[in-house]
Design a protein with these regions (language model features):
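Generic enzyme active-site microenvironment
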Residues: 55-56, 197, 326, 333
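Glycine-rich FAD pyrophosphate-binding loop
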Residues: 33, 47-67
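FAD/FMN-dependent oxidoreductases across multiple families
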Residues: 10-11, 270-377
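C-terminal helical "tail/cap" subdomain of flavin- and related membrane-associated enzymes
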Residues: 297, 353-492
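Conserved FAD-binding catalytic core of PHBH/FMO-like flavoproteins
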Residues: 166, 173-174, 180-319
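Conserved phosphate-binding and hydrolysis motifs of nucleotide-dependent enzymes
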Residues: 34-39, 200, 327, 340
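Conserved N-terminal helical subregion
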Residues: 22-27, 77, 85-88, 94-208, ...
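Beta1/beta-strand and adjacent pyrophosphate-binding region of the FAD-binding site
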Residues: 21-38
Length: 492
């Protein structure tokens, strides 16, 4: 007992000294910009390692966003590893068991796969507990506030409400020493051996370190439905038709989020046609299940329409001494599959392992940190490449714009109808349960081959030779959908 008390005293003294350095000199082991999904997770993980952390956030008010409201099972598992799973409590979170895909009115239930001790899924499901995994859906703002409360409880983390405005650089080495900020209207500065930029999809610092920019070809427009009568409660709903996809999922006991994808320059959503409300009323409502229409129509009349760009940005290797970009500032994919938070939490888990004090005692050891970031860049791809590629490929199919893509869309739905591994594999990938890129490759081309077969045999007999020839175009379209995103992952 004496030994334990004696060893605890120096640690407590170090903790007090570190806090004094943060409070008086604004100096820490790590400065993190952005107390969002990734920033909170990373701050808490590093604080638990005994690192001294300053977390900057421009506003600690509860955010009001329309994305970041569905956490896949792989994200729930990562939250557990971070010791933050209790953040899903007391926010009226809804259990999510899978998806209900509705294709021109026909439904297929897609449940997350059972992870049994002796199953093939178990072999592919790295780190997922035995049993049937569950996701969670919730109000984004409530979840963020719970994450922030968790971080505030960590004695090694100081949360500061301030707006980061610029980076502090060493004049001789050009390495990053910290950030300049505005706090309570006054200029200030915060210094760390490592600066982590996690300021979200619209990062003000990203363009200083990357020449490329996020690619966005559509927006999600959002409504909040009250007491909607969903076809399959506790499931995400994906509605497919001759227009872009529609998502429906509960975010509370009484609230359901509706996300409507509207591509750029869509005629029915143009100002001349009456704008987005015209598109929602005259194009979207008729495509909804009849039981959902009353709540949807009421939301159109009641809600202020809000939107978010659907962006794609492949990750790049961090090479700047003293600074790393992470979260949406580093990597984004289409939010159709709800994979963003799962990627963020798993990145925090992996990075905390690579930054373990037993491996990197001091985070101002820039050579060691950059070496760890090279490892991080490639190790994360078992999960992130799968989620990134799947999100982009599924969006291309679900928002089919030509005959070949519509053939692939139909083939995808028929593939789901086969059940068994034809459901377990794809939804296991989407849920962050299966983390093997080859499994994605296998299922995608299984869908492509089924699509080609259906394209040939479901036409008129007299057109069989023509459709057989046209099937080549379907195959090449499948390659055109998938391979650019594979190359983007490899190139980055």
């Amino acid at each position: 007992m004496t030994t334990s008390t004696a060893s605890a005293a120096p640690r407590e003294a170090l903790s007090h000294e570190a806090k004094r350095m943060r409070d008086e000199y604004h100096s820490a082991d790590v400065v993190i910009v952005g107390a969002g999904i990734f920033g909170c997770a990373m701050a808490y993980a590093l604080g638990n390692q005994g690192r001294s952390v300053i977390l900057l956030e421009k506003s600690m008010k509860q955010p009001d966003r329309i994305v970041g409201e569905l956490l896949q099972p792989g994200g729930v598992e990562a939250l557990e590893k971070l010791g933050m799973r209790d953040c899903l409590e007391e926010i009226d979170a809804i259990k999510v068991f899978g998806y209900d895909v509705i294709y021109y009115g026909e439904e297929v239930k897609i449940s997350y796969p059972q992870v049994a001790g002796d199953s093939s899924i178990r072999e592919k499901a790295k780190g997922i507990e035995k049993g049937r995994p569950e996701g969670r859906s919730f109000h984004h703002g409530r979840f963020i506030q719970r994450l922030r409360q968790k971080v505030l409880s960590n004695p090694n983390v100081s949360v500061v409400e301030a707006t980061a405005t610029d980076l502090v650089r060493c004049e001789w080495t050009d390495q990053i020493l910290g950030v300049e900020a505005i706090r309570q209207g006054e200029p200030d500065a915060y210094f760390g051996g490592l600066t982590i930029i996690a300021d979200g999809y619209n990062s003000k610092f990203r363009k200083a370190f990357r020449t490329d920019a996020p690619i966005s070809k559509s927006k999600f427009w959002a409504l909040e439905l009250i007491d909607a009568d969903l076809p399959m409660p506790n499931h995400g709903h994906v509605l497919l038709s001759d227009s872009a996809p529609i998502l429906l999922y509960q975010i509370g006991t009484h609230e359901t989020r509706a996300l409507i994808d509207i591509p750029e320059n869509l005629p029915s959503a143009s100002l001349a046609a009456g704008g987005v409300k015209n598109h929602l009323t005259n194009v979207v409502v008729p495509k909804l299940p009849a039981r959902v229409r009353p709540a949807f129509t009421a939301a159109i009349a009641r809600d202020r329409l809000r939107s978010m760009p659907n962006s794609f940005l492949p990750a790049t290797t961090n090479k700047t001494p003293g600074l790393i970009l992470l979260g949406d500032a580093l990597n984004m994919r289409h939010p159709l599959t709800g994979g963003g938070m799962t990627v963020a939490f798993n990145d925090a888990v992996l990075l905390s392992e690579l930054f373990d004090p037993a491996v990197i005692p001091a985070l101002d050891d820039h050579a060691a940190v950059l070496s760890a970031m090279r490892t991080f860049h490639w190790r994360r791809k078992n999960l992130t490449a799968v989620i990134n590629i799947l999100a982009q490929a599924l969006y291309a199919l679900f928002a089919a714009e030509d005959a070949q893509l519509r053939a692939l869309q139909q083939g995808c739905f028929e593939y789901f109808k086969l059940g068994g591994n034809c459901i377990d594999g794809p939804v296991g990938l989407l849920g962050g349960i299966i983390r093997q890129p080859f499994v994605l490759f296998y299922h995608f081309f299984a869908v492509a081959l089924l699509s080609i077969w259906l394209y040939i045999v479901r036409g008129k007999t007299v057109l069989l030779p023509v459709r057989a020839l046209g099937s080549v175009g379907v195959f090449f379209k499948a390659c055109q959908v998938l391979f650019p995103y594979i190359f983007a992952e490899l190139r980055s």
